């Protein structure tokens, strides 16, 4: 009997070991740190616990670190992660440098990944020359928060009836609240690059940054109007100033309307603000657009990666999409997997309007080969064009020149 029991235990141990050996191990790098990093780690842990075929090792780091380390790993052929999360704007340049592999859509379909399962505004932006280089985890961007208690107090709710807030309505709300004794600010100028690109997208057809795909070429009249609108709001006293802590002002009831990222929702909740979310402030509700981005799963080039590992990655990515409710709830993001649209808990979240397929044309996701250079150039003129340090025409010319010079220097 003892020999039989020992034999059975030995077989169980052997089978357990064989199962563990059969698991495919993949390395995953992400740009999520801090609170988002902890939430992402929890999602990875949930995947690992859900099955025994794939083990995912998650390495979080800042976006800047990842964008420096991964190309170096590809060049040396050493330490290349099997899957990464990157911002969608970076994908065209990675493809141009031949740093990314496209997905085998037949293979990933075996794991459940299909185009129709995803937010189309995000999916198509990572389709290049009919090849799919990214699978979106989410869409996220710069929208509008309002302090509902202040709106109730000062009788401002009529401007919310259609679900949009225009620039004229911002001024109307500020004037009406001030007439009743409100001493705070109406609106903020915060991360101006994100605000400006949302407003520009409402005016420039296709929110173009280039004509030929390479050289910078802005719609100058559209950019000028967007900049002039921000400058006018500042000069007329409706907005926060350069030195203001605009977030604290909103948390403390000293601001009516706050332009911020959806990822700040948890902080607003923690501050105890009774709030609602709307699209970015617009010129015309018929053409409302908000600057948006998307975290995408990509696979950097690695000749040693096997088909088995590619399938393991696909299983992981599909799980993350189907189980991204926590990403919406705790990280404040908008899952790109459309199955979440049918989940009542998500539908009740304030950012859920960004997932509405009928409103995908309101998501201004930018696509430009030299996005990194453009991002640096447009960010450099923040506040300068608002406070008059630089003339608006000169600011626009400076953006284009800086990008063109940087391209020429490569």
Short names for language-model regions:
Residues 46, 50-118, 153-155, 256-257, ...:
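Extracytoplasmic "Venus flytrap"/periplasmic binding protein-like
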Residues 33-55, 378, 396:
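Short, polar/charged alpha-helical segment
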Residues 171-176, 212-242:
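Glycine-centered hinge/linker elements that transmit conformational signals in sensory
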